[in-house]
Amino acid sequence: MLRIGHRGARAYAPENTLASFKRALEIGVDAVELDVRKTKDKQIVVIHDADVKRTTNDEGLVSELTLKEIKNLSADGEKIPTLEETLDFLDKKVKVFVELKETGIEEQVLSMVHAKGVEKNVVIISFLEDALKKIRELDKGVETGLIYAKHKNPIKAALELKANYLFALYRFTHTANVQKAHENGLKVVVWTINTPEEVEEYIKKGVDGIASDKPDILTRVNA
């Protein structure tokens, strides 16, 4: 089972920063999950929200700020990294789930993945089905995953998108869903689990990976 640090180890360091990814590596994760968006000057940065307000000392839309302006922000004492910086830092040590938070960045993200030679380490995931469709049109080989909370038929959607993973909100994930996904050749990752009891529960359900803000709870279990 994949032990995945959600936005690094966001319970212990500012989310989506190199400090957070460093902490996740120190804990001993198998993978990290991160989010990407495009700046005003078309640079791919690692940040979850469309606005920088929640995670930095300023406010404004990522899409309306240049990379230089974003680099001047403080994320609780840390800097917002670019995707390139993050891939360099992780250096193929772990699998990387890259969540596309917007459309229109698919080609750029793929180009970076190929330039760094990390195609085998990266899984591109998104709630945005159009983004996943575009990724698959551009690249038949890279792994992808459909993220969802509530979805009428996520397995059907994932198969139509030729995805490899379902990235499911944990409380809507049941043993029968996991078994059906596996029967259809899909791997199931659940997010976001932050208690040891729930970790054990979802391991028993047969999931292929768990994403946690506290990834140390994942490294304590045998799976």
Feature map (PLM): residue ranges:
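Phosphate-group recognition and catalysis centered on beta-loop-alpha active-site segments
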Residues: 1-223
